[in-house]
């Protein structure tokens, strides 16, 4: 046993050397790993094996080059359509940053609907799936074989039998679809893939990198993107959770092209095959006469460990810094890095009405402690913090100055910004932004406001937990 501990300690030293001199991570993350590998050697060793290893640089660059080249094929055809309305002109620098960092095309011919409850969303999804004529592409983090999951799987299987191309991509950790349901889909002609599978059912050394996206695209006519996964709990059927508050979008128009490109890139990666895109088959022609007439500016922005930049985080950062009047944020998990924390503080100190809404009943106690560790600094700067009490808040949204908003899969935490594969839609439109604001204020009615006075009354155990877990927050 003593020999084993010495071996683990030696390996941990090698890990530390690699983190400092080879991986060259940011100082916060580096110090967090040094602390846990040094003072908790056995636990630290296990955690590092499961959560600490970076995807190799070779894979990073290979995937990034594929991403850039593939998307550039069709992005070139959109350049002549790059026009900005008055709202979008205010955010020209954000639009250009998203384009330069992620090849995120700015489009205007879009219709966008918002969904705040799973019942109406799932009904609409099944309705659109049943109308499919050419293809259905679906990519989800969590997909369960429960009542709603089976309904959607049955709809997919039915369309596959009719000859519609059906591709279903799920995350290896989030997936819990029964094998018999997968077999039925495949037997009907559908295709099913797992993103980052482990080398056996219960062991996955790439657990640190999750495909957190929730995407559904049908015939390039309609797409869905947002925070809802597929399962009965999102319908409020889990007694331990209760009501599930989330936000999702339904998209029609040119913005679908970037979402389709993202799906195809993820699919080819999971399929371990080269990607040969048939533009006519999967993408909307920008000259089509069937495009929506609405002028709703939008960009699909994706990020992940395969990207050299943290695109969604950078987009949030620009929105926060550009806010002049108000800034409303909803996120189930709140673990900002120092630049993001300081941006929120500076916005409030500059007179911007900054409101952040978090779950009052979090699903993980340690995530509550981490979030709480940032409260005092934010409250002192004038940031208003609210805890949602009517069930669980899972929405990932940001809206500023009644003119710009973002909805998607990314939480406001280090994991979503740098480790998970995520996608958000950035919407440059007053009507959509005001709808988001209205829902935010509806949610405020069932929130508890956090004040410095009430916060200082928390228990000693909570204070100790916050202090300890804050040290490893860069790893969360």
From Swiss-Prot:
The active site is at residues 212, 214, 219, 394, 396, 401. Keywords: Cell membrane, Lipid biosynthesis, Lipid metabolism, Membrane, Phospholipid biosynthesis, Phospholipid metabolism, Repeat, Transferase, Transmembrane, Transmembrane helix. Its EC number is 2.7.8.-. PANTHER family: CARDIOLIPIN SYNTHASE, PHOSPHOLIPASE D. GO terms for biological process: cardiolipin biosynthetic process. Its main location: membrane. Catalyzes the reversible phosphatidyl group transfer from one phosphatidylglycerol molecule to another to form cardiolipin (CL) (diphosphatidylglycerol) and glycerol. The chain crosses the membrane at residues 2-22, 31-51. The lineage of its organism: Bacteria, Bacillati, Bacillota, Clostridia, Eubacteriales. Residues 207-234, 389-416 form the PLD phosphodiesterase domain. InterPro entries: Cardiolipin_synth_Firmi (IPR030874), Cardiolipin_synthase (IPR022924), CLS_N (IPR027379), PLD-like_dom (IPR025202), PLipase_D/transphosphatidylase (IPR001736). This is Cardiolipin synthase. HAMAP family: Cardiolipin_synth_Cls. It is an enzyme of class 2 (transferase). It catalyses: 2 a 1,2-diacyl-sn-glycero-3-phospho-(1'-sn-glycerol) = a cardiolipin + glycerol. It is a multi-pass membrane protein. SUPFAM superfamilies: Phospholipase D/nuclease. It is found in: Cell membrane. The keyword Transferase applies. The keyword Repeat applies.
């Amino acid at each position: 046993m003593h020999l084993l501990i010495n071996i683990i300690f030696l390996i941990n030293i090698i890990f530390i050397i690699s983190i400092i001199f080879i991986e060259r991570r940011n100082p916060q993350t580096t110090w967090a790993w040094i602390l846990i590998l040094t003072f908790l050697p056995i636990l630290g060793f296990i955690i590092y094996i499961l959560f600490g290893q970076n995807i190799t640089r070779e894979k990073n660059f290979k995937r990034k080059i594929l991403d850039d080249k593939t998307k550039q094929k069709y992005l070139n055809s959109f350049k002549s359509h790059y026009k900005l309305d008055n709202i979008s002109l205010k955010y020209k620098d954000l639009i250009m940053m998203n384009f330069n960092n992620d090849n995120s095309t700015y489009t205007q011919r879009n219709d966008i609907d918002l969904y705040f409850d799973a019942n109406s969303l799932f009904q609409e999804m099944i309705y659109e799936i049943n109308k499919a004529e050419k293809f259905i592409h679906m990519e989800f983090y969590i997909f369960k074989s429960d009542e709603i999951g089976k309904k959607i799987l049955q709809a997919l299987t039915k369309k596959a039998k009719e000859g519609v191309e059906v591709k279903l991509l799920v995350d290896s950790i989030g997936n819990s679809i029964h094998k018999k349901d997968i077999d039925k889909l495949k037997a009907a002609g559908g295709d099913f893939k797992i993103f980052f599978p482990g080398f056996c059912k219960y062991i996955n050394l790439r657990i640190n990198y999750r495909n957190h996206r929730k995407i559904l695209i049908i015939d390039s006519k309609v797409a869905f993107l947002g925070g809802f996964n597929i399962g009965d709990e999102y319908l409020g059927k889990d007694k331990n959770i209760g009501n599930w508050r989330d936000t999702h979008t339904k998209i029609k128009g040119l913005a679908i092209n970037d979402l389709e490109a993202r799906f195809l890139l993820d699919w080819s990666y999971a399929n371990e095959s080269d990607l040969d895109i048939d533009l006519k088959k999967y993408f909307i022609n920008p000259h089509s006469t069937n495009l929506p007439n609405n002028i709703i500016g939008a960009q699909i922005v994706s990020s992940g460990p395969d990207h050299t930049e943290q695109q969604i985080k950078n987009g949030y950062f620009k929105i926060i810094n550009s806010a002049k009047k108000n800034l409303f944020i909803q996120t189930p998990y709140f673990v900002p890095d120092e630049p993001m924390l300081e941006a929120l503080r500076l916005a409030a100190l500059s007179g911007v009405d900054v409101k952040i809404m978090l779950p009052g009943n979090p699903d993980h106690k340690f995530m509550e402690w981490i979030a709480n560790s940032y409260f005092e600094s934010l409250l002192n700067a004038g940031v208003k913090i609210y805890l949602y009490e009517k069930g669980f808040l899972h929405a990932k949204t940001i809206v500023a100055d009644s003119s710009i908003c973002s909805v998607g899969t990314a939480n406001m935490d280090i994991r979503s910004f740098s480790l998970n594969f995520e996608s958000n839609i950035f919407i440059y439109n007053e009507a959509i932004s005001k709808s988001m604001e209205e829902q935010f204020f509806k949610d405020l009615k069932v929130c508890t406001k956090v004040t410095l006075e009430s916060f200082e009354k928390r228990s000693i155990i909570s204070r100790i937990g916050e202090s300890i877990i804050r040290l490893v927050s860069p790893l969360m």
